[in-house]
């Protein structure tokens, strides 16, 4: 079975969780890491034995080897990075929350639809009160 080549954008705590999880998946391989902090990026690349590193996510997205990305950055950056990744032809695993407002969420969905790529949300706490409130707002069209 051929491995899916993955780039992880954001090397903080959540990015490390993703990188460690991918290491346990037989058909996945993290081939690139991206972080705006060069020291942290170098440390995580060495720890996870990842050769390709980027401090600019656009450079990672331009890498034709990368088929999918995990977006593990601060919440205010979820939408622009997810949209750029989908527009670059990458599948996207997007950490929660999807974004900070409904209009940006619609933009992400539109980018997904236009790209034909997969978008997966990391919503492991779907039953939390906050998630239920968001669900109710979406259903009410707000």
Can you annotate each of these PLM segments?
Residues 25, 48, 63-64, 128:
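Acidic-histidine catalytic/liganding microenvironments
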Residues 1-48:
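N-terminal Rossmann-like dinucleotide-binding module
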Residues 48, 88, 114-115:
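Helix C-cap/helix->beta junction micro-motif
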Residues 28, 67, 90, 117-118:
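Short, well-ordered coil/turn segments that N-cap beta-strands
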Residues 18, 51-108:
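Beta-loop-alpha module in the N-terminal Rossmann-like domain of NAD(P)-dependent dehydrogenases
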Residues 99-142:
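A contiguous active-site-proximal alpha/beta segment in oxidoreductase catalytic domains
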Residues 10, 37, 56, 101-104, ...:
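Acidic/polar helix N-cap motif
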């Amino acid at each position: 079975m051929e491995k899916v080549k993955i780039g992880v954008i954001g090397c903080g705590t959540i990015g490390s969780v993703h990188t460690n999880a991918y290491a346990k998946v037989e058909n996945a391989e993290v081939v690139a890491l991206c972080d705006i902090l060069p020291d942290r990026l170098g440390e995580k690349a060495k720890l996870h034995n990842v050769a390709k590193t980027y401090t600019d996510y656009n450079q990672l997205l331009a890498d034709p080897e990368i088929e999918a990305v995990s977006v593990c950055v601060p919440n205010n950056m979820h939408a622009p990075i997810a949209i750029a990744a989908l527009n670059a032809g990458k599948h996207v695993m997007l950490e929660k929350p999807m974004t900070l407002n409904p209009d940006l969420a619609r933009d992400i969905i539109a980018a997904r639809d236009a790209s034909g790529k997969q978008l997966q949300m990391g919503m492991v706490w779907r039953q939390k009160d906050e998630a239920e409130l968001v669900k109710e707002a979406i259903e009410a069209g707000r």
